[in-house]
């Protein structure tokens, strides 16, 4: 069975993760079938290859709990279920994604025209999420 999971890399206590498609019986840091994204928990930065992820999900790949949470935060699971605009480059802040989830409205994806180096056959979509550094305090009532 193919799983979408995190592959750890980086220094001690400065870890980052790649989101990869791997056989479920492979070791955590083994050779992946395909690299599909990046997650840095220290800076809360996430980059996702949206078409690659939706293709793997359609082929029956199962995301781990952590990867599922990352995909939900980026609205990739909703996009893959509805098939809406998975070819566009998506840039989403955490506040926008949270607001869209609570209001049950789809986030409008805008094409990223910054890099024109990639041809149409090689184009990959990416989703980027960045958590705000100032989180409101949690009050205990």
Swiss-Prot record:
Residues 89-101, 109-129 have a biased composition (Polar residues). SUPFAM superfamilies: Ribosomal protein S16. The keyword Ribosomal protein applies. PROSITE patterns: RIBOSOMAL_S16. GO terms for molecular function: structural constituent of ribosome. It comes from the Bacteria. InterPro entries: Ribosomal_bS16 (IPR000307), Ribosomal_bS16_CS (IPR020592), Ribosomal_bS16_dom_sf (IPR023803). This is Small ribosomal subunit protein bS16. NCBIfam families: S16. Belongs to the bacterial ribosomal protein bS16 family. GO terms for cellular component: cytoplasm; small ribosomal subunit. Keywords: Ribonucleoprotein, Ribosomal protein. Residues 89-141 are annotated as: Disordered. Gene3D superfamilies: 3.30.1320.10. GO terms for biological process: translation. The keyword Ribosomal protein applies. Coiled coil: none annotated.
């Amino acid at each position: 069975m193919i799983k979408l999971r995190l592959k750890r890399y980086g220094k001690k206590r400065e870890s980052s993760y790649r989101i990869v498609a791997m056989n479920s019986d492979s070791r955590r840091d083994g050779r992946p079938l395909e690299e599909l994204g990046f997650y840095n928990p220290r800076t809360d930065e996430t980059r996702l290859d949206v078409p690659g992820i939706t293709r793997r999900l359609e082929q029956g790949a199962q995301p781990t709990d952590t990867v599922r949470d990352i995909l939900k935060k980026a609205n990739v699971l909703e996009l893959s279920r509805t098939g809406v605009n998975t070819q566009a480059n998506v840039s989403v802040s955490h506040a926008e994604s949270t607001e869209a989830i609570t209001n049950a409205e789809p986030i409008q994806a805008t094409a990223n025209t910054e890099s024109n180096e990639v041809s149409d056959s090689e184009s990959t979509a990416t989703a980027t999420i960045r958590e705000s550094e100032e989180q409101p305090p949690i009050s205990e009532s």
